[in-house]
Structures are given as C-alpha cells and as structure tokens.
Regions:
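Alpha-helix boundary/capping and short turn/kink residues
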Residues: 20-23, 38, 80
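Enriched for short, Lys/Arg-rich terminal
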Residues: 2-6, 12-13, 55-60, 65-95
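Arg/Lys-rich, positively charged N-terminal/basic patches that mediate binding to nucleic acids
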Residues: 1-29
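Generic N-terminal leader/processing signal
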Residues: 4, 27, 41, 50-52, ...
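Conserved catalytic core of Hanks-type protein kinase domains
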Residues: 17, 33, 65-66
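A short, surface-exposed loop/turn module that caps and links secondary-structure elements
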Residues: 31-55
Length: 95
C-alpha cells in the first residue's frame, strides 16, 4: 500500500525555489515516506496529521500531511527551520 505525493500550490512554489541538490535529498526521503508515512518521531504537535522531514546539514524542513482515506501525502510547506519559519507557515495554511 503506497501513498501518492501531492503539493499544495504554495508549497510547490517553495519547492521550485530550492537548489536541485536539496530537492533530490527531499525526494529521496519522500519516496521512503510513501511506504510508511506515519513516523512517530517526526510527528508535529499542534498540527493534525502532519509530520516533518529534516535535512540537518542544510537546515531545511519539509512539512507534510497524511490523508489515509485517499492514500495521499500532501506537502504543506518547505523552508528553513530558522525561527520555526516553516512550522509557522504550515500552521497558518491550516487556518
């Protein structure tokens, strides 16, 4: 049972601004998430059904929401971790 990855329109714009090397690193991790998206250690508090992918060396984060009914992973936000920027963006997009 594999999940499909989709992007919110605003998250796709953020994705396209990333360096290709960063995109490739995220793509590799997203592919793994398609098999098992519910990673307990990556679960975000305060945002329902959302998880994060961290790229420690570059400081980038990707926030995704898991929709089990339709087997979809929706990328909600992509950005730097600085001042919790990406997490604030993600929570704003659910309001």
């Amino acid at each position: 049972m594999s999940y499909t990855v989709k992007f919110r329109e605003d998250a796709l714009k953020e994705w396209q601004k990333l360096d290709k090397a960063i995109q490739q690193q995220f793509a590799k991790k997203l592919k793994k998430c398609c098999e098992n998206p519910h990673i307990t250690s990556a679960k975000l508090r305060g945002i329902k059904d959302c998880y994060k992918i961290k790229l420690r060396t570059s400081g980038f984060r990707l926030v995704y929401q898991v929709i089990d009914d339709t087997l979809v992973i929706v990328v909600v936000a992509v950005g730097k971790r600085e001042r919790s920027e990406v997490y604030n963006l993600a929570s704003e997009r659910f309001r």
